[in-house]
């Protein structure tokens, strides 16, 4: 008997600065539909979802609520998981970024990439919007404010670690060109190629404390 082909699917992990919204629900419903469809085709599916529980915005929200950040994310993550279970989504694992096992695996992978030279130390600098948790260049600002939410931004600079995505740009372009079904739908493939890969893929900051 041949081994079942494997299929891995994950959602973005929901941010725990507040209650879940329709966008989170929409995403997991779509992922659940794909997972169920692939199982019906005979695939060995592993479907993962979860919550992102780190960030300055969470710290500020916890302070406003008069509780610790851990207590705050515990409440939000529990509510998100309750809703996913209420909807009978068929995920195989619900990951929390505060889980001991998750932290252990992240450290293991980070060290492996650092030892390999794929992660290096540098500086990240820009105008930072706390509500959006995003950095912007001066040229991206609208009237000196965040282009996404319109709130004031603050200059920020800190030492950080970067992943050498630029090192893999040519390999990614070649793979996408030889496997046109790799990114779907086609509009997203074109967006990735034209907006990120072909102009020159930038290294990714992976350790901001903000």
Where are these regions (language model features)?
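Structured secondary-structure scaffolds
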Residues: 2-49, 101-105, 158-210
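A short small-residue
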Residues: 12, 56-62, 89
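Short glycine/serine/threonine/alanine-rich loop segments
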Residues: 43-44, 67, 89, 118
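Short, solvent-exposed turn/loop segments enriched in Gly/Ser/Thr/Pro and often Arg
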Residues: 47-57, 97-102, 131
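A charged helix-plus-loop insertion that forms the helical arch/lid used to bind
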Residues: 61-74
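A broadly conserved sequence feature marking short terminus-proximal activation segments
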Residues: 72-128
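Cys/His-rich short segments
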Residues: 116-173
């Amino acid at each position: 008997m041949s081994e079942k082909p494997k299929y891995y699917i994950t959602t973005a992990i929901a941010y725990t600065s507040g209650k879940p919204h329709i966008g989170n629900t929409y995403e997991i419903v779509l992922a659940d539909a794909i997972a169920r469809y692939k199982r019906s085709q005979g695939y060995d599916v592993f479907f993962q979802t979860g919550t992102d529980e780190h960030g300055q915005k969470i710290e500020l929200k916890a302070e406003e609520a008069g509780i610790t950040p851990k207590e705050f994310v515990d409440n939000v993550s529990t509510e998100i998981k309750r809703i996913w279970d209420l909807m009978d989504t068929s995920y195989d694992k619900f990951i929390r970024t505060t889980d001991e096992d998750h932290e252990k695996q992240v450290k293991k992978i980070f060290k492996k990439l650092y030892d390999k030279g794929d992660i290096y130390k540098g500086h990240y600098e820009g105008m930072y919007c706390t509500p959006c948790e995003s950095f912007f260049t001066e040229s991206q600002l609208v009237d000196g404010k965040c282009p996404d939410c319109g709130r004031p931004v603050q200059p920020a600079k800190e030492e950080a670690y970067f992943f050498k995505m630029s090192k893999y740009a040519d390999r990614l372009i070649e793979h996408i060109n030889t496997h046109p079904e790799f990114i779907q739908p086609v509009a997203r493939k074109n967006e990735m190629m034209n907006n990120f890969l072909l102009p020159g893929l930038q290294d990714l900051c992976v350790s901001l404390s903000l």
